């Protein structure tokens, strides 16, 4: 078993991604052919469940883009289901400390290394037990990325980085800026300083730093600092702003107030 995304991070090859929030397999397949290295299927803020994640994994599978799945929470039951339908790389939200990071890793590993339940006869991940020795290969193919999104998590970053099995740490600029008192303004100098310091610290620890940033200048800055998995856009934003701009160019009567938001 292989995990091309995990291998790329280990090799230090920057991976450029796109966020998927439309919760639809047709749009996921369309975007899988756009040339991004990875696509984030969002189960935290988009209306996804295990079934819709499955159909998007199936839609993306024939393409080079690698899927990353974000569950709604650091929940071992939900993680088990996502792994069974074929997710190999998970982005775990709101990890605050090393204990929570260890729990995330344990949820992705079969015993004795972890607590993942064994149900491979029912699992797409094992191709319904057609992958030889799946139970002994699966652990090494898992890629665990944890999100730090608060001042508390930032203060615990060093201990989180010490957790065995953590492949990367993703900085959540929207929640971090809100927690720091600058909601809706991740470009505030204090927030930017925290982000840049974290990227350098994560990379120095031998882990992969990641972030979502639609501002192209900032995204390139993070890559220069050593970020290895950077999402540079969101499908819902691309569609909404593109449609609004097209309507405006043809003098559409409905006048929209200026769109706002972090991404």
UniProtKB/Swiss-Prot annotation:
Keyword Lyase annotated: yes
Alphabetical keyword list: Aromatic hydrocarbons catabolism, Lyase, Metal-binding
The Swiss-Prot or TrEMBL record lists the needed cofactor(s) as: a divalent metal cation
Which pathway is it part of?
Aromatic compound metabolism; 4-hydroxyphenylacetate degradation; pyruvate and succinate semialdehyde from 4-hydroxyphenylacetate: step 7/7
Q: What is its EC number?
A: 4.1.2.52
Q: Where does a divalent metal cation bind?
A: 149, 175
Task: Describe the reaction catalysed, as an equation.
Answer: 4-hydroxy-2-oxoheptanedioate = succinate semialdehyde + pyruvate
* Site annotation Transition state stabilizer: residues: 70
Q: Name one GO biological process term.
A: 4-hydroxyphenylacetate catabolic process
Q: Which residues bind substrate?
A: 147, 174-175
Kindly list the GO CC terms recorded for this protein: cytoplasm
- Purpose: Catalyzes the reversible retro-aldol cleavage of 4-hydroxy-2-ketoheptane-1,7-dioate (HKHD) to pyruvate and succinic semialdehyde.
Q: What is this protein called?
A: 4-hydroxy-2-oxo-heptane-1,7-dioate aldolase
Tell me which species this is from.
Salmonella paratyphi B (strain ATCC BAA-1250 / SPB7)
User: What is the gene called?
Assistant: hpcH
